[in-house]
Regions:
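Short secondary-structure boundary segments
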Residues: 4, 36-37, 106-108
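Hydrophobic/aromatic ligand-binding patch that stacks against planar heteroaromatic rings
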Residues: 24, 94, 114
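Short, well-structured N-terminal submotif of metal-dependent ribonuclease cores
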Residues: 1-34
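Short, flexible helix/strand-to-coil boundary loops that buttress conserved ligand/catalytic motifs
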Residues: 11-12, 46, 115, 133
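PIN-domain endoribonuclease scaffold, especially VapC-family toxins
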Residues: 24-78
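Active-site neighborhoods of divalent-metal-dependent phosphate/nucleic-acid chemistry enzymes
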Residues: 69-103
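Acidic, PIN/NYN-like endoribonuclease modules and their adjacent C-terminal/linker elements
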Residues: 98-101, 108-136
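Short, active-site-adjacent cap segments at secondary-structure transitions
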Residues: 7-8, 40, 110-112
């Protein structure tokens, strides 16, 4: 599964590791988990003035629709209170409910520091791509 910050980064920089990751997902190289919480966050963040000024609404809408329609929707998220940033606990709940192998994030301050949560490895996009020999 992929942290919302990775999805936003992919939208903002079409030539980047997050964008390459999204291409691999679209090619069916891995499954993507999502939840209504993540979709809500994605819609909210793409409307921030500092993001909206750098991002085409059409491009943002396309990715949101793709994630909603093609990702595996995880429901019945457990209550989780582990992350130093309480706003990220829903990502750990998604990982738990969806039995995710990986949680890919750029959050060095909070999520990457955890390294592992209930069997889910928490790593950077770069580490994931290197591990799977998918670097561009």
């Amino acid at each position: 599964m992929v942290d919302t910050n990775i999805l936003i980064s992919a939208l903002l920089a079409s030539v980047s590791l997050p964008a390459h990751l999204i291409v691999l997902w679209r090619e069916g190289r891995f499954d993507l988990l999502t939840s209504t919480d993540q979709l809500d966050e994605l819609m909210r963040v793409t409307r921030y003035p500092k993001i909206r000024g750098r991002l085409s609404p059409t491009l943002a809408g396309r990715l949101i629709n793709e994630v909603r329609d093609l990702a595996i929707m995880v429901t019945n998220l457990p209550s989780v209170d582990v992350c130093p940033d309480p706003n990220d606990n829903y990502l750990l709940a998604m990982a738990s409910a969806g039995a995710a192998d990986f949680l890919l994030t750029g959050d060095k301050r909070d999520l990457l520091g955890l390294k592992l949560f209930e069997g889910t490895k928490i790593i950077s996009v770069r580490d994931f791509l290197v591990m799977h020999r998918r670097m561009p």
